[in-house]
Amino acid sequence: MLDLSLPSGLRDLLPDHSAHLAELSSKLHDVFSRFGYRRVFLPTLERLDVVERGLSPAALADVMKFVEPGSGEVVAIRPDITPQIARLYAARPDALPSPARLCYDGPVLRAREARAGRPREVYQAGVELLGAGGASADAEALVLLARSLERVGLKAPRVEVGHARFAEAVMEAARLPERLRSAAWEALSRKDRAALAAAAAKGRGSAEAREAVPQLAGLFGDGALDRARAIARAVPEAAASLAETEAALRIARRRGVREVAVDLGEARGLGYYTGITFAGYAPGAGAAVARGGRYDGLLARFGRPGPAIGFAVDLEFATQALERVNGRGRGVRPRRASARGGRARARPR
């Protein structure tokens, strides 16, 4: 008998659900356009070396690759669209002068599920601001994210802001032994003060830096910026990243973004993001519907160095958030992977 089931982690989207995704994408592109972002369409397949050049080490396991029958070339199904944008920007300076504001939507496919029950194929819409650095560009991305979430119908969405270099600067100043660094970052991702303190006690840095390491787990919620300022006074290496964060927040707030939270102990995206990071949340939701940040190191990998910042909205997460808010239940669940499938760590967006 013919097996009509789909591979694990994939699913069909029926007409009603497809219409919701299309409507969300249309609303997002309306906002993107008003901010001056121009839409591009990109292929689903890329050469493997292009894809790998644009991913963090943790995301390489998410690449689905195969040998193209005709050419014998190794190609990959995109697990993320940002590297494609970087490749396009580097390849076409004639058509894309700096700064370039580009937007996109489309599916990405990852080799493994990010979490049990989550699909491997994710529909995204996003923006990239290429060739613009500084607080003004950071704030533009924050404001655009907030306006985008409002436009799709999420009332009082919350934007959470961090900085990739703040915790990293503190960890480096504490001079943790090489064998403990990975464990310390894992502890920070769990907000585990005790484990951070144990790792810091073995550090060879200043007493102030070692004392600051467990405090990273508390740099969220009310008073987070005050606590971060105290750390930056004790650990001057962290001061620049805090100043960048506060500058972007001041501009974003002047432009009307009010629901902003801070988490400067965020460990997501280590090795990929180089500056401010942010996530967008629906009211009452624990999972982010959008993620992004500054990734100034990426464009140089493709031969056109420069600053860059962007974010992507998970269209299905956004749809599900709207369904919760409106009391409807049209969510679509993917076919679950077997226990052998394990967990995936996708690129941090």
From Swiss-Prot:
Name the record gives this protein: ATP phosphoribosyltransferase regulatory subunit
Subunit structure: Heteromultimer composed of HisG and HisZ subunits.
Chief subcellular location: cytoplasm
HAMAP family the UniProt entry points to: HisZ (MF_00125)
Species this chain originates from: Anaeromyxobacter dehalogenans (strain 2CP-1 / ATCC BAA-258)
Family matches, as SUPFAM superfamilies: Class II aaRS and biotin synthetases (SSF55681)
Stored NCBIfam families: hisZ_biosyn_reg (TIGR00443)
Localization (cell): Cytoplasm
Region (Disordered): 327-349
Biased composition (Basic residues): 330-349
GO cellular component, one term: cytoplasm
